[in-house]
């Protein structure tokens, strides 16, 4: 699955050619893609690359990426030469179960056999899941049950297929796939650090007209409506 993600990033670069390349965490593919499509209709040459933020930052170091949409806290810990941030909204950690399997509270996770989570080192919501497990006092009980996967899209795939009993994802995917899950439980925000999603401007953005248009676009009412629709407010 990781190999497929890397291939998708490479394909975006090849396909993009001289186009502006914007990277984003895989859990934000849907809203960022909608924003990109609106810009394309306006004549802006722009493409997106999507994977967990760890993989995106590796790609960004090659200098081909102009901006990254992701967790500010995560990006600030990287050694990328970030020139500034444009705040988009706030995300949330959500627990979901497959259709047909219902739970009412996170305490019931102790009764489940397998729970998927994004990579704790490379993915935004893997970091937040780890924080939640520690702060809730559930870490010791749930550690043997946890199945780490690349990122939010992979957790969603495991949950929907019924290969796991539950999974931790972001509010964006929870909203986008409404009706495809059994239970949808928003985790108490006091149990993990805030998730502020921003567009980080990289050196390739400076003096780039297309990048300036992208940054301006995410501030427009139509883009704010898109992000709000996918749970970013």
Where do the PLM segments sit?
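Hydrophobic anchor at the start of a short beta-strand
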Residues: 46
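Generic cytosolic/nucleocytoplasmic N-terminal low-complexity/intrinsically disordered segments
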Residues: 1-2, 178
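Exported/periplasmic ABC-transporter solute-binding proteins
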Residues: 16-41, 49, 54-233
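Sec-dependent N-terminal signal peptides
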Residues: 3-12
């Amino acid at each position: 699955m990781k190999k497929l993600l890397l291939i998708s990033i490479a394909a975006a670069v090849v396909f993009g050619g001289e186009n502006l390349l914007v990277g984003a965490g895989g859990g934000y593919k849907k809203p960022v893609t909608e924003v990109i499509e609106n810009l394309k209709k306006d004549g802006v040459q722009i493409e997106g690359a999507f994977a967990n933020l760890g993989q995106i930052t590796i790609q960004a170091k090659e200098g081909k990426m102009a901006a990254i949409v992701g967790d500010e806290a995560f990006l600030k810990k990287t050694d990328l030469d970030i020139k500034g941030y444009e705040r988009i909204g706030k995300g949330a950690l959500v627990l979901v179960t497959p259709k047909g399997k219902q739970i009412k509270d996170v305490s019931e996770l102790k009764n489940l056999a397998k729970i998927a989570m994004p990579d704790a080192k490379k993915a935004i919501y893997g970091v937040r899941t780890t924080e939640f497990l520690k702060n809730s006092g559930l870490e010791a009980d749930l550690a043997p049950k946890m199945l780490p996967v690349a990122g939010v899209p992979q957790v969603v795939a495991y949950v929907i297929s019924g290969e796991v009993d539950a999974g931790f994802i972001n509010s964006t995917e929870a909203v986008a796939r409404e009706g495809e899950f059994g239970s949808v439980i928003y985790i108490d925000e006091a149990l993990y650090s805030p998730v502020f999603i921003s567009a980080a401007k990289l050196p390739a953005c400076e003096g780039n007209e297309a990048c300036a248009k992208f940054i301006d676009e995410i501030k427009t009412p139509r883009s704010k409506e898109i992000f709000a629709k996918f749970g970013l407010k």
